[in-house]
Amino acid sequence: MSVAFAGNSTSGSSREAGPLRVMIVDDSVVIRGLISRWVGAEHDMEVAASLRTGLEAVNQLERINPDVAVLDIEMPELDGISALPQLLAKKRDLVIIMASTLTRRNAEISFKALSLGAADYIPKPESTREASAADTFHHDLIQKIRHLGARLRRKAAVASPPLAPASPPPAARAPFVARPAAPAPAANALLPGALSTRPFSTLAPKVLLIGSSTGGPQALMALVTELGPVIDRFPVLITQHMPPTFTTILAEHLARSSRRPAAEAVDGEPVKPGRIYLAPGGKHMRVVRSGADVAIALDDGPAVNFCKPAVDPLFTSAIDIWHGAILSVILTGMGSDGMRGGKDIVAAGGSVIAQDEASSVVWGMPGAAANAGICAAILPLNQIGAKVNRLFAGDRS
């Protein structure tokens, strides 16, 4: 999985204290003004620069030295997708959030940006009039800046631990007592053994449910490459926090990665093995009984956990169909979506696997499940596929 903040900065280490420095790069003066005002109103972040083109951002990056960049895709002189690799070449740990309107072309470019090292993307309102009243855009952007920036700070703290205090003069030095060294935990990291897991269900799973958010597209594409045997024999349903158009592109990427059929779910279609069903942007995906079959039910109701689609509606609806014969996986993402649904699955006799903190872009959703004590396993992304395959093959350990 490629993320923007892997590795060390070549332009100086990121600050471990003080507000996050945010560089805003957009050719719309209205958008720049709105984002500047929103960022400036937060106590833990500040506007480092407000620039009109990608070329300005590349040329001034060393002087500005931001922690986070909000980068528009369509700009004069140098567009966002062209500026992205140049910015990361100068500052490898820069967190870059791509901003684009909801067109198919921009969605495809956003996916390309993720593969080139962007940390995340955010859909931008179609017009400046919409932007000024875009509460969702405001909320989501600030949360992405905050959570992605916090992860950068934690990684920097681990990479550069505080210097030890100077040794006292020899006369004042205490007698030496040998003790095993204990590494200091990362900021906000959980101590080993602090998380408890429960046994996997003794019931054979009949369906695989997956929920994800920030960092999810990369994680999902990596995971489904390993799940061919499961997809062939069991239904696989995925909810990824994503807007319309973006989910269309994601489904196409999942089909290519898995080499199995994958598409946005359609209201009323039967749920069968052999394909991946993805919740479409802007709709909750549930499953319902339809005679002797199981069918998709799309829900245009209010957001759940600030999200639409949300993971909890899928998880809870599946219990009425498969009872405890459910394996659910919660991947990287902000917030706690999936935790309540995961609790219900466990109460019904099913199992939950969460992605671990080290391999998550943001350890919100999987962390909430892990801290709730509902997980049978908390694993790095590169171990989840093999575990899922074993569980569906009959291994309950």
Swiss-Prot record:
Phosphorylated by CheA. Phosphorylation of the N-terminal regulatory domain activates the methylesterase activity. The modification 4-aspartylphosphate is found at residue 72. The active site is at 213, 241, 337. It comes from the Bacteria. It is found in: Cytoplasm. Pfam families: CheB_methylest, Response_reg. Signal peptide: none annotated. Gene3D superfamilies: 3.40.50.2300, Methylesterase CheB, C-terminal domain. It catalyses: [protein]-L-glutamate 5-O-methyl ester + H2O = L-glutamyl-[protein] + methanol + H(+); L-glutaminyl-[protein] + H2O = L-glutamyl-[protein] + NH4(+). Residues 21-139 form the Response regulatory domain. Residues 199-388 form the CheB-type methylesterase domain. GO terms for cellular component: cytoplasm. Keywords: Chemotaxis, Cytoplasm, Hydrolase, Phosphoprotein. It is an enzyme of class 3 (hydrolase). Contains a C-terminal catalytic domain, and an N-terminal region which modulates catalytic activity. PANTHER family: PROTEIN-GLUTAMATE METHYLESTERASE/PROTEIN-GLUTAMINE GLUTAMINASE, PROTEIN-GLUTAMATE METHYLESTERASE_PROTEIN-GLUTAMINE GLUTAMINASE 1. Belongs to the CheB family. Involved in chemotaxis. Part of a chemotaxis signal transduction system that modulates chemotaxis in response to various stimuli. Catalyzes the demethylation of specific methylglutamate residues introduced into the chemoreceptors (methyl-accepting chemotaxis proteins or MCP) by CheR. Also mediates the irreversible deamidation of specific glutamine residues to glutamic acid. B.japonicum does not have a chemotaxis group 1 operon. This is Protein-glutamate methylesterase/protein-glutamine glutaminase of group 2 operon. The gene is cheB2.
